[in-house]
Amino acid sequence: MQLDTSILQCPLTGEELHFVEGKELESIFQEKREIRNLSILKGLVNQSETYFYPIIDDIPLLLHDYAISTGRETDKLNNSKKKENVRVFNYYNEIDFERINNVERYNDAKKWLDSRDVAHSYISLSLLRAKKYLGKQGKYLLDIASGPIGSNEYLELSGNFDIRICIDISLNALHMARENMGSRKGIYICGDIKNIPLKTNICDSVLCQHTLFHVHKDEQENALDELHRTVKKNGKIVIVYSLFYHSLFMNITLFPIQVYRITRHLAGKLYSKIFKPKSHLYFYSHSLAWFKRWAGNDKKIEVYSWRSVNIYFLKLYIHKKLGGAFILKHLSNSEEKYPQVWGKIGEYPVIVVTK
């Protein structure tokens, strides 16, 4: 579908954006030969014509890394980025994909999802769980850091909305998302959760799954502020998060494994500081108390269960010959019956913020 520029804003200046191509594009870059020589046919420019963003395969690249200064003003592109953010950007732009059930997904999904038959129903129900909190209808659903929308369950999450706005730092993931969406209406934008290139109060609901903990710990609050800015009044922000060592249930049932995970996590941080890998998946989990401090008294925040156990629990305790399907059925029923309890003590809560 055709991109509606009226919903967009420049991620660097907050100004409106408009299309440029042909002679208008040449006039903007008349003093920059290195840009004129590139085969960029169209793009978006901000109101003051200080920054240009290319459009590739009908996907606007509204990301700091792809912004081009027109030279008309002192630019902001040299601001240093946290090395952790650079590594996450590289990770998701270098990762390969695999096709499962006619849907393209990241090939690292098997690290976090149990694909065994014994866990299939339990996993499938959890993947659909965010839908009940997103709202019954609306025009725009923002799927921030959408990735390739790598499961049929994820595709269903936007069923109550007219248009799914998929924003991700990976152009490859957006190509896969567009392919997976098929005939469903979608807008695909290369952008960052910390500087969402959408105007204020545009989206009816916002979906943020397994993303926030990959943002630097000091910038997660800013990312939350951006999610809150883009959603309409009374709109829902639905965040699927990992509590990691803040999960009481995982700490009790997986104590030795949790100690190992924490040790490995700390070792990974040390490795990154010493060897400085170009691509590395940053992770930091805040507590639920941190979210409540962010919300304060002016934001309504609720916590429910998305899935109470992680893949380590499933691989250790759940086996077909040992009644694994029976155990998971009762666990899933308990999550449905006591979502707020499991949301507070389980591995993966759904954090719902109402604006």
Model segments located where?
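A C-terminal cap/extension of S-adenosyl-L-methionine-dependent methyltransferases
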Residues: 2-5, 16, 25-41, 289, ...
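Class I SAM-dependent methyltransferase SAM/SAH-binding core
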Residues: 142, 147-195
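A short beta-strand submotif of the Rossmann-like class I SAM-dependent methyltransferase core
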Residues: 208-211
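A short glycine-rich, Lys/Arg-flanked "PGG" loop and its adjoining helix->strand segment in the class I
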Residues: 221-233
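Short alpha-helix
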Residues: 279-298
